[in-house]
Amino acid sequence: MFSIQQPLLVFSDLDGTLLDSHSYDWQPAAPWLTRLREANVPVILCSSKTSAEMLYLQKTLGLQGLPLIAENGAVIQLAEQWQEIDGFPRIISGISHGEISQVLNTLREKEHFKFTTFDDVDDATIAEWTGLSRSQAALTQLHEASVTLIWRDSDERMAQFTARLNELGLQFMQGARFWHVLDASAGKDQAANWIIATYQQLSGKRPTTLGLGDGPNDAPLLEVMDYAVIVKGLNREGVHLHDEDPARVWRTQREGPEGWREGLDHFFSAR
């Protein structure tokens, strides 16, 4: 049992979880966001999005100043009050976006893999793919430590591509809509553990953690949470955890922000 009155951190994915996959609406989650903010519970956004995108969304959601996890864990944006931490304001894990782009261009030219990265197109095209405005779409191209792409080849070639990336110290990760390439050492789980340890160091007590996500790339995050909400999503593979004890894991019946609200209701309303 736990409550929002005890030291608590909430880690949340964005698209398909806190945000509607199509409209990007988050209003069904608004009452819980307000309640958590009033209880001084940090809601830490965790996504494949760039830090530039997430800082914009963080402000929109009333979560500005809190830490966040961008680019599937390859980037940690530090909390405003953590200015004494080395690397402030952001910590980058592994190799840079530019280096990954060079690797991908070489693989495409020499081994003829078929894919389109966000670097290959303009913001108007990304806006068409995502439904974002052009100004918001431009923020999706500001990667620091990963590359986002659309795969346009066979499953067999994907397996070969994944193996080649692994040989080069990279990983190929599936998101709700797109695929992401980042350093093999990076991950939402490592980033979350770092943030948890930082809060513990600052407060002297390890906070209880609750994570919410809807896609395969959220599984590593949810695995390291004390409690997890698997929001019903669009991805056909879904989310599968090693420990799905009903006492710690809740699968929602609703999608997006309504599922997010359902998950919070499940763990807190009756407590």
Curated annotation (Swiss-Prot):
Keywords for this protein: Cytoplasm, Hydrolase, Magnesium, Metal-binding
InterPro entries linked to this entry: HAD-like_sf, HAD-SF-IIB-MPGP, HAD-SF_hydro_IIB, HAD_sf, MPG_Pase
Q: Where in the cell is it found?
A: Cytoplasm
CDD domains per the record? Answer: HAD_Pase
Which cellular component, as a GO term, is one annotated location?
Answer: cytosol
List, alphabetically, the NCBIfam families matched. HAD-SF-IIB (TIGR01484), HAD-SF-IIB-MPGP (TIGR01486), MPGP_rel (TIGR02463), PRK03669.1 (NF002976)
- The entry's protein name is Mannosyl-3-phosphoglycerate phosphatase
Source species of the chain: Escherichia coli (strain 55989 / EAEC)
